[in-house]
């Protein structure tokens, strides 16, 4: 029973990681109608920014985390302003090639700057173990879960209540109508990419004390987040979050009770099974984010 609880909590931690990355990916597609295959590199860059601020500059964990998140939010803004705005009106083939090229470029730049050796970011919380009834967990995992709840609640409030969030919802339903009634669609797109990059960076800040950062960490993460977005319903943020947690828990249980070798295949098996039963995702066909 203790093993099951440990695996379940580990799965929730993985789910929180996938959900923060997948939520940004779903937000981008829902609002801008573009699949960003360089999205995992936002996580990678956020992890390196956090590592540098925390280990090299010696900043406190919260300060280093906020700095990394802010830097990546600015990077997401610049990425939309330069790369995405240039290709948005082009065919999906051009968009695919451009975002994949960005992913490869960022990965190789990370190798040049940081090397190929994984970077460790141990914290006091990641090395402190909580033991309750035979269940042993690093405090960092509980921090990840608590922070994820706060982040998703904040995202929900922002999308539902704020002026920019309402503009995002409107743009996800009809971009042309938004432009006609005076919504600044370019500013909405900028905000969408800035928020999505910040979500990926926040995931890196929270999870890198548990998992190392290395240059190509974003590649597989992008694919798993993409699987969660498809399983949850393309462009539907809540669906992507729910699917991410289901994938994380299933992945952890499969690694614990079957074989660790099958772990990375779980997300894609889950996606295929969902699409066989519900072709439009867990929550069916939806309009908007």
Identify what each model region corresponds to:
Residues 4-54, 79-94, 231-237:
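Single transmembrane alpha-helix segments in multi-pass membrane proteins
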Residues 86-161, 188, 253, 258, ...:
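Transmembrane helix-bundle core of multi-pass membrane transporters
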Residues 14, 20, 136-214, 237-242:
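Helix-loop-helix "hairpin" substructures at the membrane interface of multi-pass membrane proteins
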Residues 25, 58-103, 109, 242-247, ...:
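Alpha-helical transmembrane segments within multi-pass membrane transporters and channels
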Residues 20, 24, 66-78, 101, ...:
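Generic alpha-helical transmembrane segments of integral inner-membrane proteins
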Residues 1-20, 49, 57-64, 90-97, ...:
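Membrane-interfacial amphipathic/re-entrant helices at transmembrane-helix boundaries
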Residues 33-37, 57, 72, 121, ...:
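Glycine-rich phosphate-binding loops of nucleotide-dependent enzymes
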Residues 18, 58-70, 190-200, 204-205, ...:
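Transmembrane alpha-helical segments in multi-pass inner-membrane proteins
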């Amino acid at each position: 029973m203790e093993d099951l609880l440990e695996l379940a909590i580990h799965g929730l931690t993985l789910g929180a990681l996938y959900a923060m990355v997948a939520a940004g990916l779903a937000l981008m597609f829902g609002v801008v109608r573009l699949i960003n295959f360089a999205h995992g590199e936002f996580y990678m860059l956020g992890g390196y920014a956090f590592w540098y601020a925390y280990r090299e500059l010696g900043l406190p964990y919260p300060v280093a985390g906020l700095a990394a998140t802010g830097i990546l939010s600015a990077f997401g803004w610049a990425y939309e302003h330069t790369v995405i705005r240039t290709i948005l009106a082009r065919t999906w083939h051009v968009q695919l090639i451009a975002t994949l090229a960005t992913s490869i470029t960022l990965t190789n730049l990370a190798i040049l700057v940081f090397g190929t050796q994984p970077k460790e970011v141990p914290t006091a919380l990641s090395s402190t173990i909580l033991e309750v009834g035979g269940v042993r967990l690093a405090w960092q995992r509980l921090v990840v879960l608590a922070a994820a709840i706060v982040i998703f609640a904040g995202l929900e409030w922002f999308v539902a209540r704020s002026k920019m969030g309402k503009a995002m919802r409107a743009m996800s339903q009809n971009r042309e109508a938004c432009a006609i009634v005076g919504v600044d669609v370019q500013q909405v797109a900028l905000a969408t990419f800035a928020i999505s990059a910040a979500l990926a960076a926040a995931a890196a800040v929270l999870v890198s004390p548990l998992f190392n950062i290395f240059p190509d960490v974003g590649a597989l993460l992008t694919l798993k987040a993409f699987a969660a977005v498809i399983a949850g319903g393309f462009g539907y943020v809540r669906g992507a979050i729910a699917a991410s947690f289901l994938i994380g828990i299933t992945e952890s249980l499969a690694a614990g009770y079957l074989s660790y070798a099958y772990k990375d295949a779980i997300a894609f098996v889950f996606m295929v099974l969902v699409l066989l039963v519900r072709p439009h995702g867990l929550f069916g066909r939806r309009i908007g984010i």
